Amino acid sequence: VVSCADILAVAAR
């Protein structure tokens, strides 16, 4: 699964 931190890291790009 994908963690919230991973989602935020991609969204921050």
Swiss-Prot record:
What's the protein called, per UniProt? Peroxidase 2
| Entry's transmembrane regions | none
Q: What is its EC number?
A: 1.11.1.7
Where in or outside the cell is it found? Secreted
Q: How is the cofactor bound?
A: Binds 2 calcium ions per subunit.
**Catalytic activity reported:** 2 a phenolic donor + H2O2 = 2 a phenolic radical donor + 2 H2O
The entry lists its GO molecular-function terms as:
lactoperoxidase activity; metal ion binding
Please provide the Gene Ontology terms (biological process) for this protein. Answer: hydrogen peroxide catabolic process
Keyword list (alphabetical) reads: Calcium, Heme, Hydrogen peroxide, Iron, Metal-binding, Oxidoreductase, Peroxidase, Secreted
Q: What does this protein do?
A: Removal of H(2)O(2), oxidation of toxic reductants, biosynthesis and degradation of lignin, suberization, auxin catabolism, response to environmental stresses such as wounding, pathogen attack and oxidative stress. These functions might be dependent on each isozyme/isoform in each plant tissue.
The coenzyme or cofactor needed here is:
Ca(2+); heme b
From which source organism is this entry?
Betula pendula (European white birch)
